[in-house]
Curated annotation (Swiss-Prot):
It comes from Rhodococcus jostii (strain RHA1). It is found in: Cytoplasm. Keywords: Cytoplasm, Hydrolase, Protease, Serine protease. It catalyses: Hydrolysis of proteins to small peptides in the presence of ATP and magnesium. alpha-casein is the usual test substrate. In the absence of ATP, only oligopeptides shorter than five residues are hydrolyzed (such as succinyl-Leu-Tyr-|-NHMec, and Leu-Tyr-Leu-|-Tyr-Trp, in which cleavage of the -Tyr-|-Leu- and -Tyr-|-Trp bonds also occurs). The active site is at S93 (nucleophile), H118. Pfam families: CLP_protease. Its EC number is 3.4.21.92. Belongs to the peptidase S14 family. The gene is clpP3. This is ATP-dependent Clp protease proteolytic subunit 3. One of its GO terms (cellular component) is cytoplasm. Fourteen ClpP subunits assemble into 2 heptameric rings which stack back to back to give a disk-like structure with a central cavity, resembling the structure of eukaryotic proteasomes.
Length: 202
């Protein structure tokens, strides 16, 4: 594909298109509805095109909407492909949840990435009844996030609840030791094989 073939696309769109063709999705910035729509659509399209080859998610995100993040999480689990997750720079809050929710054995951090885990938060206001309803919903989201992290890291829910009660920061090595990622890499060659089409024949 050439730039001339897509005159209405800007550089970022062209870059995203090239990455998509390499079965690579970038999750950068706040996790919101726009990110969820794009990521879920691309995951489904890539799975439909080839249900066996890996899909790679590079994550550089401070987190954001729990609902948007859970939409991406559910789609990652829905597709039959292995999903390689790569922490690139900063993966916090819902970004950290998505990072550790990749296919086990294929959750990766770059050497100087920072990862942060904490409990979900949200602004609460309105009448007393509204506040009670919102508080119940927030508590349910918190428990759901803790159960996901427990399943992905192998730690008991009670330990996840304790460890995420306040912001907890991890270096790449600490995240590996905790079970958030499986490997810390410093070479693209350690990630690139996941995006390479299988060879047929000799």
């Amino acid at each position: 594909m050439t730039t001339a073939a897509l005159p209405d696309l800007n550089y970022r769109d062209l870059l995203a298109d090239r990455l998509f063709r390499q079965r690579t999705i970038l999750l950068t910035g706040e996790v919101d509805d726009a990110m969820a729509e794009r990521a879920c659509s691309e995951l489904v399209l890539l799975a439909a095109a080839d249900p066996k080859r890996d899909i790679v998610l590079y994550i550089n995100s401070p987190g954001g909407s729990v609902f948007a993040g859970l939409a991406i999480y559910d789609t990652m689990k829905l597709v039959p492909n292995d999903v390689v997750t790569v922490a690139m720079g900063f993966a916090a809050s819902m970004g950290q949840v998505l990072l550790c929710s990749g296919t086990h054995g294929k959750r990766i951090s770059l050497a100087h990435s920072r990862i942060m885990m904490h409990q979900p938060s949200a602004g609460i206001g309105g009448t007393a009844v509204d506040i009670a309803i919102q508080a119940e919903s927030l508590e349910r989201m918190k428990r759901q996030s803790q159960e996901i992290l427990a399943a992905e890291t192998g730690h008991p829910v009670e330990q996840i609840a304790e460890d995420s009660d306040r912001d907890r920061w991890f270096t790449a090595d600490e995240a590996r030791d905790y079970g958030i990622v499986d490997r810390v890499v410093s070479s693209f060659a350690e990630i690139a094989p996941h995006t390479t089409a299988p060879r047929i024949g000799l």
